[in-house]
Amino acid sequence: ESIPMKSLRCYNDYNSQVTCTWMEHSEAHDLLGMTLYQRNNIIMENKDMFCKRQTEKDLQKTPDAYVHWVCRNTRESFGIGVDFFYGFRPKKVLQAGLDVDLFQNVQPLPPQNLSVSLMTSGDFLLTWKTVDGGQELGNALEFEVTYKREWESWEGAASLLLPSTTHCSLSREGLVPGSSYVARVRARPGQASGFSGHYSEWSTEVSWKTPGGSVEWSGAMQGWMLRSQNFPVPYLAPVLSEGGLQPRNLRCLFTGGDRLTCSWEVKKVITTSVLFGLFFRATPASAEEECSPVHEKTLTHTPYVVQSCEIPVSNSSSQRHYHVSVRAKTEEKHIEAYKNIQVQPPANVSVTATENHEYELSWIKHNLSYSFITQRYQVKYWENNQYEKVTYKVQES
């Protein structure tokens, strides 16, 4: 839930007036601003509520990072069976859209099970497996293998480009004896395959040590190991939107199998007031669907967060063109009027001395929509200027 929806509290006098209070982050208010609306199940029309900003004096509290609101509206009908719904609408339209051709936006999953073994020739054999991305794509991948000594940087690593294979050999003549090496591999659609897109992320690394001098291979290879390391996703050309409010850098990548992963960036402070959703159509005539769940990752040193969602792909050969859009979702809350009554305070309170030296307190009560609903009163009184000595009495009518 957003902060406005989480903080929303609404009550009514069960006669004509509805009052709501809520808050939003002050920076989100300055950038965007939200409008509270109300609807019931009889009229079924959203009606904006009249809202007034509350001051620190109104709240009797110190300033904080939020803007507090009190909103009011009048209604003619209350009762069990009359349902009230409340929601927030941003004062600006927030959305971004993209047409996606699956076969032109491929990013394979990283190769798995990378391993190294010593051949009888003394060369080293690297092998790996591809993750199922569909038979067509699986036969159309090319691979990049990079390897280096452990202490060297990847920028200076040796690189091999290999079309449609899941192994390669490294000649012992090209390796320094008695050195520790590390290798990794990634995949991309082959240039002549009819697919296009981007490299996968790198596989996990594999490490080994070359024999040195008279050292036997069996001893030198003891303890070669696999280790995991995360590598940055290669840069992709962004779809940018004007202004700092709109979702930006919307992009979608197809694994070649059964998933289309879309991601976008939004200002973090705006997400305190608005929840963004990803919506898609597999064909122009199909009904729009919402992708779920949406994941979020914070970016360091930037006011933006990355949100993402995976769209299931059932038949990429017959449905390869998708339209996706990111926009603010509609949040609504059902608040039952008869369970959230706050009666208007009694009017014309007066005190009368009785003949037996007692005092009688009287007032005019606030009428509810239904006369059979009883009201319970709390009377509070004290000696003049002695508020700490308070006495309560409770009475029903």
Question: What spans do the regions from the language model cover?
Answer:
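Pro/Thr/Ser/Gly-rich low-complexity, intrinsically disordered linker/stalk tracts
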Residues: 1-26, 94-137, 197-268, 331-370
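N-terminal Sec-dependent signal peptide, specifically the hydrophobic helical h-region
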Residues: 1-7, 31-36, 45-52, 82-87, ...
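Solvent-exposed loop/turn segments flanking beta-strands in beta-repeat/beta-sandwich domains
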Residues: 6, 25-47, 131-151, 248, ...
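An aromatic-rich alpha-helical recognition segment common to small helix-rich domains
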Residues: 22, 88, 111, 126-128, ...
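Short beta-strand segments within Ig-like beta-sandwich modules, predominantly Fibronectin type-III
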Residues: 51, 59-68, 157-167, 199, ...
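Beta-strand-rich modules
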Residues: 61-99, 168-196, 304-337, 396-397
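Extended repeat-based solenoid scaffolds, especially LRR ectodomains
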Residues: 263-265, 277-330
